Amino acid sequence: MDIDLEGTVGNHLGESSTVNAACDWSGPVDLTAMDCGEHMTMGDNSPEDVLLNSKLSKEPDKYLSLSAVNYIDPNDPPVIIFHGDKDNVVPNCQGKKFFELLKAAGVKTEATFPAEGGHGGPAMYTEENLQKMVHFLDNVRQKRNGSL
């Protein structure tokens, strides 16, 4: 799938939109296997069905195209992942799967899985976790600029 995300209009065309690093805070990364074997529902629909206003059985290509795990590439920028063990919206197996797939592809990655962390909230956004994120991004920036 070739999607043009750059655009061709405006005064920004000389600027790069290359992503130099990414922070994943409890993100869904595989919409085709989101519940990791645990049935999570929102009425008659799973959280991903509600998000996409569809069903995997009806539009599998839609779910595949919106799943980050299908785009992992050894040239991807460094990624830091934070995903709480008690996330009841996006199961933390999503973060663990992302971490393992990024490592297997040779992408620089770090991950933190707070034992009491949910889908956001104080157990996730601790000073320690925020400092880990800042440190990670600073290191990427410094390496990119040749400072390290």
For every predicted segment, state its role:
Residues D2-D4, A33-Y71, P77, A104:
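Mobile cap/lid helix-loop segments that gate and shape the active-site cleft of serine hydrolases
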Residues H12-E15, N70-D73, K143:
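Surface-exposed acidic, glycine-flexible loop patches that form ligand/cofactor-binding
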